[in-house]
Regions:
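Beta-rich accessory regions
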Residues: 22-64, 84, 91-104, 124, ...
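Surface loop/turn signatures of beta-propeller and other carbohydrate-active proteins
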Residues: 23-28, 32, 63-82, 111-149, ...
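Structural motif
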Residues: 53-54, 104, 171-175, 232-238, ...
Length: 571
């Protein structure tokens, strides 16, 4: 089946016109590829096990672009588009291609199969050919995706930018991809508006709606800050006057520099308390906090975290927000810190700290040794929130994968999905304050009107609890996921060791366990082909795990004091 799907993908992507081209082989690992025909895109054949090729795009004796692609050596796994219409004013393009490795013994790169299969076309087919692509989660149309970036809401539209590799389904060529949605469920890919430049690849960052034109780019301009990943990591700015469709990079980039090696992922927000912008930025094993009047000139205020929380890996992708504590008149601040590795089940995870922030310094209310995790699954990372979300909501998305195996999961046309949207809040339990995580109202609105007892490959399952329970999802192949709630111990666990395909990484098969702060009365379980996300109905527990069953789970077995459940298809 896998071979047939792959064959169809290759055949569809190959529909096009053979290029009017000239290939000049200069050495065993170096060639020039000249393109005279100007269709919309050049279809590049990719083989994931091949060595990386660096391609310099040259026109009129000027280097226009540089990218890295695993050009097919002896088989074609899939195609990616290189859009020629970026260079409409140029009659001829030359691709200066240098392949890593030494190929003297096998005839050199002139024997690569890519030269027989490369061609131009007027369009690139993004029809899904993947068994595991989810139905109600955001995924890239093609290529690799990791961190969500620059998210904002404006004029009824949710804008999601994301770390995107347009030239392969493994990490490389970091660019900001862009998708939009009116309901947080159905997404439309809008292209790659922020691309690498002389300062480096485009790493993670944030966007804000500048309602009062503080930056001088226009009222309601979209202002983005991102990390330029060059020889050193620096922070750069871009702005949009067409509601995020296109961006202009600021002439004064980079606007923030440092000699700290891991210096990245700026997240900014308007702080009404001080009438200024604040920004939080990962700097090694701590978070730096800045303030600004105009989004261009930033003043360092303080650092947080050197002695707090988990330090098993790199700190990155921060967020900082003020929220009400459920059932009280209190307001507190929550600082989000994503860490890799060092998560509770290994690899990537999202930790958080609750406390106070005066616009200058964050003060954590917990002891330094206390670590709080937002989600206890293995596949919840790079969690950040949308700017300008309606009604004061804090709507978050995460990258649904783990750096332990993200490049190896069994998909090729695309890699990675985002979590379902989640609303964040705060609640108290036994004198401590924790983050509540609940599925956003938009996902509930997507339910079918009538529930059933039959599982589908894309559904929500609601289970009423009256105490201990074991819930098993299984299929005819004997593949299963076992979820266990122990009321007395206040724990919930998920066992995916027999869930389906697990052999692509020794780190994948796992049992994940979460604390539950109080009694659970209802579970909400979201299944979408290759993922299972579980929430306590009141937001006291969240767990996100990928699964790759060879057939969809179609059987539910519940043991315990309750057997009441309902299944809603999601549309």
């Amino acid at each position: 089946m896998k071979r047939n799907i792959l064959s169809v993908l290759i055949a569809l992507a190959s529909i096009g016109t053979a290029c009017a081209q000239e290939t000049q082989f200069l050495s065993n690992n170096h060639c020039l590829y000249r393109i005279q025909q100007k269709d919309k895109c050049l279809l590049l054949p990719v083989q994931e096990s091949a060595e990386m090729s660096n391609i310099k795009v040259i026109a009129g004796n000027k280097q226009m672009k540089s990218l890295n692609v695993r050009l097919a050596m002896n088989k074609v796994d899939y195609y990616v588009p290189f859009y020629l219409d970026e260079f409409n004013e140029e009659k001829t393009l030359a691709l200066d291609i240098h392949v890593n490795g030494n190929y003297r013994n096998d005839g050199g790169i002139s024997t690569f199969t890519c030269w027989k299969n490369i061609k131009t076309a007027e369009s690139f087919d993004t029809t899904n050919h993947e068994q595991y692509r989810p139905l109600y989660h955001h995924t890239p149309a093609y290529g690799w995706m990791n961190d969500p970036n620059g998210m904002f809401f404006n004029d009824g539209v949710w804008h999601l930018y994301f770390q995107h590799n347009p030239y392969g389904s493994q990490w490389e060529n970091m660019t900001w991809g862009h998708s939009t949605s009116t309901d947080l469920i159905h997404w439309t890919f809008q292209g790659d508006p922020v691309q690498p430049d002389a300062w480096g690849a485009i790493f993670s960052g944030s966007s804000v709606v500048d309602k009062n034109n503080t930056a001088g780019f226009g009222e309601n301009a979209i202002v983005a800050l991102y990390t330029s990943a060059g020889e050193n990591q620096t922070q750069s700015m871009a702005y949009s006057t067409d509601n995020g469709k296109t961006f202009t990079k600021y002439d004064g980039n980079p606007i923030i520099t440092s000699n700290v090696p891991d210096f990245r992922d700026p997240h900014m927000f308007w702080n009404e308390n001080i009438k200024k912008w604040n920004m939080i930025l990962a700097a090694g094993q701590q978070m730096n906090i800045y303030s600004s009047d105009n989004l261009k000139d930033w003043k360092f205020e303080s650092s947080f975290g050197a002695e707090y929380g988990s330090h098993g890996g790199v700190w990155e992708c921060p967020d900082l927000m003020k929220m009400k504590v459920r059932g009280t008149d209190k307001e507190k601040w929550m600082l989000v810190c994503n860490i890799n590795p060092g998560g509770p089940s290994g690899g990537s995870a999202t930790q958080y700290f609750v406390g106070d922030f005066d616009g200058h310094k964050f003060t954590c209310e917990s002891k330094p040794e206390v670590t709080k995790w937002m989600d206890y699954g293995k596949d919840h990372y790079a969690t950040v929130t949308f700017d300008n979300a309606p009604n004061g909501r804090h709507v978050a998305l995460a990258w649904m994968s783990n750096w332990q195996y993200a490049n190896q999961v069994p998909t090729m046309q695309y890699r990675s999905a985002n979590s379902i949207p989640r609303d964040l809040g705060l609640f108290e339990y036994k004198g401590n304050t924790y983050c509540s995580v609940t599925p956003s109202e938009e996902i509930t609105a997507a339910r079918s009107k009538k529930p059933s007892k039959s599982l589908s490959e894309a559904c929500e399952m609601v289970v009423n609890l009256k105490g201990d329970a074991t819930i098993t999802l299984s299929n005819s192949k004997g593949e299963k996921v076992v979820m266990t709630y122990k009321a007395k111990d206040e724990t919930f666990s998920m066992d995916r060791t027999l869930s389906g395909k697990t052999d692509f990484s020794s780190d994948f098969a796992a049992i994940t366990t979460a604390p539950v702060y109080g009694k659970m009365n209802k579970l909400r379980i979201f299944i979408d082909k290759s993922s299972i996300e579980v929430f306590d109905n009141d937001g006291k527990m969240a767990m996100t795990n990928l699964v790759f069953p060879t057939r969809p789970y179609d059987k539910v077995t519940i043991k315990g004091k309750t057997k009441k459940y309902a299944v809603y298809k999601l549309k």
